[in-house]
Amino acid sequence: MKQTIKVLGGPLFVVLTWSMLTVISYFLSEACRLTTNFFLLFALTFLLYFGTMGYGFFYFHAFPSHRISPRYYRKKKFESLGFYNTLGVEFFRKRLINSPFKKLNQRVYLKGRKAYVEVFYEETKRSETSHLIGLLIGLFFHLMFMANNAFVALSCSVFFNLVMNLYPILLQRYNRIKIRP
C-alpha cells in the first residue's frame, strides 16, 4: 500500500517556501549569534530548529524520488527495544505524545486497525528522513556558531538539534522495531 502526499501548490510553492526558510534561518542564526539575552537566544534557537524541520518536510515530501537507500532503514545489529530504552526514547515518546507537538502530524497515529500498520511503518520512514535532513542542517549551524565563538548559541543549538531531530529519528526507528521486531 503506497501513500503519496501532494504538496500544496507544487514545485513553485516548495521553491518559494525554501527561499523563505533560508532567509528566515539566516536572520535567526545571526540574531542567535549576536544576542546576549539567554532567554531570547533560547527562543530564537527554537525557531531556527523548527524551521530546519520545515526544510526536511518540504524536501522529502516534494521530491520523493530522492529517497535514502532502503538499507538505511533496516534494523541494525545493535538496535533493540532495550537499546532505545537505555537512551531514553520511551521517556521522550511519552513526553511527546502529551505535548502540543502531537498535533503536528496526525497521520502517524494508529487508528486501531491492521490496515494502518503499513501506512504507519512507511510514515516512520518519511518522518525519520525529514528529521535527518533537519539534523544535518543543524550541524551546519553548529559549525557556524563554533566558527564565530558563539558557544552559548552553540549549546542551545546542540540541545535543540538533539531534542527536535536526533530523538525523533531514534523514536521512528524504535517504532519500526516495535512493529516488526
Regions found by a protein language model. Give the residues of each.
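Structural signature of transmembrane alpha-helix termini at the membrane-water interface
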Residues: 23, 27, 58, 140-147, ...
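Membrane-proximal soluble regions of multi-pass membrane proteins
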Residues: 61-120, 177
